[in-house]
């Protein structure tokens, strides 16, 4: 069934990858890597109903030409029997390089599925979408079939997708049949003339391989042995299951080298004797540096730009002054009670004490703001310029895996996700180092086909962007630019190219938007066909009996006429959102290592791309397995599944995650982030956070959707301590930091001002030396040497995944091109080609995304994205900082990424509710900053403490917003009299607040309007969503009631009628009740207070002015909320008036009943106020 060389995999409609070992406890199929056996390729067939079943005995007999009888006992055994034919003169294995290329083409055209208690299947996709796939890297790309009778294999193809025909007669022949023809005389089956080239290497260019020495004993090098590694093997390390030879020991301890790509440099005294210069001399195990490193002038990749002292020093001084004034004011308030209204005084003092603490927690982390700058020219010079160690100028940049997450195509339109994918594929980063993984947590065919359409359109869009330096590289945003698109474009063919691409994009949008109807019509047609067949079979079987109605589950069908293994439109068993198999489809296979330039007028490419590299990055569709009874852990679980599958398939040492509605606005953003990771000291940076920027927001930013105070003030300030918090998207991670390892040279901080006034600590030399030697460390282990036998307990039983960890650690190191660079790697180490994909690799990826893989491991606890909170992003970043990792805030001149934000009031409140609920969960969990380790700086701890505490301010804020109204109702005030001392304190506190705001605006670059909008929404959110979050958090902690949230709906991006239509839609929610009541009560209180003062015998204007001033202060903050209730033309839902009026009247009457006015207060002579 399978050729002995492993290269000629013949398959029918689908292939099945079955695991060979099973655990005795639950029958769970073990991962191939876990047991050491690589997955075996066997076969299955597709039934008329679209399902896959193993070949029956009759099928196998007919396929193999066997007419003899087989016993029932041997039949089942035969189904999974694997025959390996030994090599003979008539049966020689295919060349490994050609075999790997053929298998990669098979893998890229197969849909892999599998999971719990099921085999892993590889279904060959003849077509992925209704339209034709034109790019040779794309799944289902057009290819010819072999012309030999009885052979349905694909013809060999080159990197452009063109058929490779070894004879001048252009007879189409596959690799297996060509090898057979050569053995049987070397004559072409078509024209019968002898082949001029009889070696596959002459027909298909052999893939370059690493110049590693062969392992002893003539054993073939395995896939993992061809990868880089840096860790020395240990006895406890997981061994290769050959039984004869420990490949890991040979890999980690060999003296072979391949230039500076080896993990161990020669000693200093060996550099001049052939150890350096890229020649590949012997290894001494030392850590000396080649001479060429020290001879080059060294330039940093990044610079820290400090805030001018003329701005920062007054800013810090004002913080101290305001802190002192607040302390004196609170002390004065406590001493001077209002005997006439003790209840009013008590409530106000408690609220003011909390506000003072809240302001302190918010302000202290802002003491050390910094700005940073990158130098992309230096990055290019260091990593992409020909050098003695890299004579061809191949990119030495590390690999980068991009994660895009989506869950529901109904709320996250496929067109938005497709545009995000296109912007990633077109990014300015080495194509062979970039991989994009799309996580579809809903398992929807709509998302799958939308991604396939995006991969097809990328064939034209990506080269067009590279040719004309297009910005931004999101087609929807680019074609909607309001500026002149032809400005600064020098190529004469730009106008023609742009018009053609615009026309193609309009057709692409039509195809994407019509996918739901297309899938529904296709599924209905196939379902009707299956019902007719079932009824026909039933009639034939029933004869004259009464025929009952046929009930067949209505499946969702793919474009090639097979069942979709994920979620069906009408959910069924094993095909629902929470119950479906794991799915992996390589939409775009890994590109070749060398540039591939297009041609003019080429079929499928009507544009001239003769000077443009037309390769595309690898694109993979992933939908993790979900089964009832397993906690899927929402987005965090999906991200962890991507971490594991990407480690098996590409293992980029860095990971960047984006939400489906956040696209790449700056094509060089990846390079900017990599500058920080590759600079001196970059090995201690756990992640680089980019600011979030938004589009489609109303010009006045009514609900502070831009959130610039947080992103430009708070985050810049945190960058001066240990770094910004992780905000969920637009973040570049170091892979081993996500794995839970400690950073190199981690320190403990005991001082409270270590960021502004660092203290030097004496560290033992032996300790430093051991940290430099040790590549991977975890605080959980006391051993100086990492015990690799513990890795399966942490990361699971996948050897592929475990073996990839030291590789990712080494590839993520900065260049050791300066004496100050610690824990670096030599230049040229990452210029080697990356391995081709094979079936066993993708099968292993299926295994690690199964629903059971995380059982009894530390995924979600200490490894990967952390579970247990709706704000898993903040918790994940906190854990990294708690281990000692640093983070960096990368603010680029041109926005790195842009996304969408909910401009509707209700959606915005629910978004804030979700964030605040996560903060409450953090406060009541072990992730509370009060329990942080000593590796976290004091001010960073304060910042995280504020993250967990800020929702509780809502309790005191609501009380304080009612105080002005209560003051006006009662005729009292929070102080006995408005004396000079109180007014002086109030004036100084207000002035210092305004001056601090001005200075923050100065060093952060935000506008005064943005600062004011933030203040307004702070009160709106604090009196609505934050209060609900506190109540929900307390219910979860006390009563164990779980909290669930729905996805925030994203705009489809194609609403041309009114860009801000959502802004005027009023959707009722209970979160609106508290702000409405506050507004109505304060308005009524102003009217009551004003009437009482006018008609009283002794008017107390000072108390009236004090109450009215604070009431107007509250109402001014709630103005955007009131405006949002008015809708487009002042149309407010009747329910709003009913609820607010009833509640306001009830509160007013309740107050009058509790504290009625004195009988001698006459209003208008005869009228007595009740």
Swiss-Prot record:
GO biological process, any: cell wall organization
EC supergroup of this enzyme: transferase
Coiled-coil stretches noted in the UniProt entry, renumbered to this chain: 527-551
Residues the record marks as active site: 441, 873
Subcellular location, record wording: Golgi apparatus membrane
Bias (Low complexity) ranges: 10-24
Membrane spanning residue stretches: 311-331, 341-361, 955-975, 981-1001, 1027-1047, 1070-1090, 1104-1124, 1134-1154
Biased composition (Gly residues): 273-288
GO CC terms: Golgi membrane; plasma membrane
Enzyme Commission number(s) of this protein: 2.4.1.-
Top-level taxon: Eukaryota
Function: Thought to be a Golgi-localized beta-glycan synthase that polymerize the backbones of noncellulosic polysaccharides (hemicelluloses) of plant cell wall.
Family under the similarity heading: Belongs to the glycosyltransferase 2 family. Plant cellulose synthase-like D subfamily.
Protein's UniProt name: Cellulose synthase-like protein D2
Taxonomic path: Eukaryota, Viridiplantae, Streptophyta, Embryophyta, Tracheophyta
Gene expressing this chain: CSLD2
């Amino acid at each position: 069934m399978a050729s002995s060389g492993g290269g000629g995999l013949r398959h029918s409609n689908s292939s099945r990858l079955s695991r060979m070992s099973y655990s005795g406890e639950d029958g769970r199929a073990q991962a191939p890597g876990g047991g050491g056996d690589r997955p075996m390729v066997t076969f299955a067939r597709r039934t008329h109903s679209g399902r896959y079943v193993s070949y029956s005995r009759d099928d196998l007999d007919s396929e193999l030409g066997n007419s003899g009888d087989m016993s029932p006992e041997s039949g089942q055994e035969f189904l999974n029997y694997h025959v390996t034919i030994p090599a003979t003169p008539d049966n020689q294995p295919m060349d490994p390089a050609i075999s790997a290329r053929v298998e990669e083409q098979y893998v890229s055209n197969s849909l892999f599925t599998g999971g719990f208690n099921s085999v892993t299947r590889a279904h060959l996709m003849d077509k992925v979408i209704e339209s034709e796939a034109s790019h040779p890297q794309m799944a289902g790309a057009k290819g010819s079939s072999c012309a030999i009778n009885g052979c349905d294999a694909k013809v060999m193809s080159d990197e452009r997708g063109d058929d490779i025909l070894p004879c001048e007669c252009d007879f189409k022949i596959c690799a297996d049949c060509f090898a057979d023809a050569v053995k049987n005389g070397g004559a072409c089956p078509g024209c019968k003339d002898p082949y001029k080239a009889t070696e596959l290497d002459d027909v298909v260019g052999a893939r370059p391989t690493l110049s590693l020495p062969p392992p002893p004993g003539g054993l073939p090098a395995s896939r993992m042995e061809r990868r880089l590694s840096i860790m020395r093997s240990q006895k406890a390390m997981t061994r290769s299951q050959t039984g004869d030879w420990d490949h890991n020991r040979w890999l980690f301890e060999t003296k072979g080298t391949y230039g500076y790509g080896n993990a161990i440099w020669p000693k200093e005294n060996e550099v001049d004797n052939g150890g350096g210069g890229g020649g590949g001399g012997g290894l001494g195990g030392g850590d000396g540096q080649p001479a060429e490193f020290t001879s080059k002038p060294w330039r940093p990749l990044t610079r820290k730009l400090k805030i001018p002292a003329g701005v920062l020093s007054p800013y810090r001084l004002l913080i101290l002054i305001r802190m002192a004034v607040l302390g004196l004011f609170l002390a004065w308030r406590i001493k001077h009670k209002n005997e006439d209204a003790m209840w009013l005084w008590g409530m106000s003092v408690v609220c003011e004490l909390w506000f003072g603490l809240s302001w302190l927690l918010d302000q202290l982390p802002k003491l050390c703001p910094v700005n940073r700058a990158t130098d992309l020219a230096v990055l290019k010079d260091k990593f992409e310029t020909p050098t003695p160690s890299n004579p061809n100028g191949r990119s030495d940049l590390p690999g980068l895996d991009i994660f895009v997450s989506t869950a529901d195509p109904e709320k996250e339109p496929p067109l938005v996700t497709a545009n995000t994918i296109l912007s990633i594929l077109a990014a300015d980063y080495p194509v062979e180092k970039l991989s994009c993984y799309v996580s579809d947590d809903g398992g929807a065919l709509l998302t799958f086909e939308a991604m396939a359409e995006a991969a097809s359109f990328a064939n034209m869009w990506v080269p067009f962007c590279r040719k004309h330096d297009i910005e931004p590289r999101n087609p929807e945003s680019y074609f909607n630019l309001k500026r002149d698109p032809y400005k600064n474009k020098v190529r004469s063919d730009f106008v023609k190219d742009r018009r053609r691409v615009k026309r193609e994009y309009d057709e692409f949008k039509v195809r994407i938007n019509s996918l739901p109807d297309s899938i529904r019509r296709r599924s209905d047609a196939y379902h009707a066909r299956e019902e007719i067949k079932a009824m026909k079979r039933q009639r034939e079987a029933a004869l004259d009996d009464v025929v009952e109605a046929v009930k067949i589950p209505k499946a969702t069908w793919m474009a090639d006429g097979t069942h979709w293994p994920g979620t069906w439109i009408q959910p069924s068993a094993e095909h629902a959102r929470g119950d479906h198999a794991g799915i992996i489809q390589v939409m775009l296979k890994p590109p070749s290592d060398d540039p591939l330039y297009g041609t003019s007028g080429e079929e499928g490419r009507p544009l001239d791309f003769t000077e443009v590299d037309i390769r595309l990055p690898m694109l993979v569709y992933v939908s993790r397995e979900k089964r009832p009874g397993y906690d899927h852990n929402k987005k965090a679980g999906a991200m962890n599944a991507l971490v594991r599958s990407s480690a098996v398939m590409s293992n980029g040492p860095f990971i960047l995650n984006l939400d489906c509605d956040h696209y790449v606005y700056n094509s060089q953003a990846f390079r900017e982030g990599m500058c920080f990771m590759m600079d001196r000291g970059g090995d201690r940076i756990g992640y680089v956070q980019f600011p979030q920027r938004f589009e489609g927001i109303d010009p006045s930013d009514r609900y502070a959707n831009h959130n610039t105070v947080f992103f430009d003030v708070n985050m810049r300030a945190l960058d001066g301590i240990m770094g910004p918090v992780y905000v969920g998207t637009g973040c570049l991670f170091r892979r081993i930091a996500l794995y839970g390892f400690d950073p190199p040279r981690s320190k403990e901080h005991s001082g409270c001002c270590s960021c502004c006034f660092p203290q030097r600590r004496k560290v033992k030399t032996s300790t430093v030396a051991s940290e430099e030697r040790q590549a991977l460390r975890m605080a959980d282990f006391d051993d100086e040497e990492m015990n690799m036998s513990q890795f399966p307990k942490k990361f699971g039983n996948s050897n592929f995944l475990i073996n990839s960890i030291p590789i990712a650690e080494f590839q993520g190191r900065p260049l050791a091109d300066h004496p100050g660079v610690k824990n670096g790697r030599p230049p040229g180490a990452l210029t080697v080609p990356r391995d081709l994909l094979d079936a066993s690799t993708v099968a292993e990826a299926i295994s690690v995304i199964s629903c059971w893989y995380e059982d009894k491991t530390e995924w979600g606890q200490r490894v990967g994205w952390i579970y247990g909170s709706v704000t898993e992003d903040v918790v994940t970043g906190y854990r990294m900082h708690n281990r000692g990792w640093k983070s960096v805030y990368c603010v680029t001149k041109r926005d790195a990424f842009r996304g969408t934000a909910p401009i509707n009031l209700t959606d915005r409140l629910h978004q804030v509710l979700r964030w605040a609920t996560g903060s409450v969960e953090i406060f009541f969990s072990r992730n509370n900053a009060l329990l942080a380790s000593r590796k976290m700086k004091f001010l960073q701890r304060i910042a995280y403490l504020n993250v967990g505490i800020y929702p509780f301010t809502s309790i005191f804020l609501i009380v304080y917003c009612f105080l002005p109204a209560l003051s006006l109702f009662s005729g009292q005030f929070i102080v006995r009299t408005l004396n000079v001392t109180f007014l002086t304190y109030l004036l100084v506190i207000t002035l210092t607040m305004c001056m601090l705001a001005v200075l923050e605006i100065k060093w952060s670059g935000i506008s005064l309007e943005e600062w004011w909008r933030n203040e307004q929404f702070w009160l709106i959110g604090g009196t609505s969503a934050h209060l609900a979050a506190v109540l929900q958090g307390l219910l979860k902690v006390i009563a164990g009631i779980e909290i669930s949230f729905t996805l925030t709906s994203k705009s489809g991006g194609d609403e041309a009628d009114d860009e801000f239509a959502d802004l005027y839609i009023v959707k009722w929610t209970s979160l609106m009740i508290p702000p409405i009541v506050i507004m109505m009560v304060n308005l009524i209180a102003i009217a009551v207070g004003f009437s009482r003062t006018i008609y009283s015998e002794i008017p107390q204007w000072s108390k009236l002015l004090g109450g009215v001033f604070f009431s107007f202060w509250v109402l001014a903050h709630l103005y955007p909320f009131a405006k949002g209730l008015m809708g487009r033309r002042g149309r407010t839902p009747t329910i709003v008036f009913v609820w607010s009026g009833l509640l306001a009247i009830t509160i007013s009457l309740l107050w009058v009943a509790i504290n009625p006015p004195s009988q001698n207060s006459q209003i208008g002579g005869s009228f007595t106020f009740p």
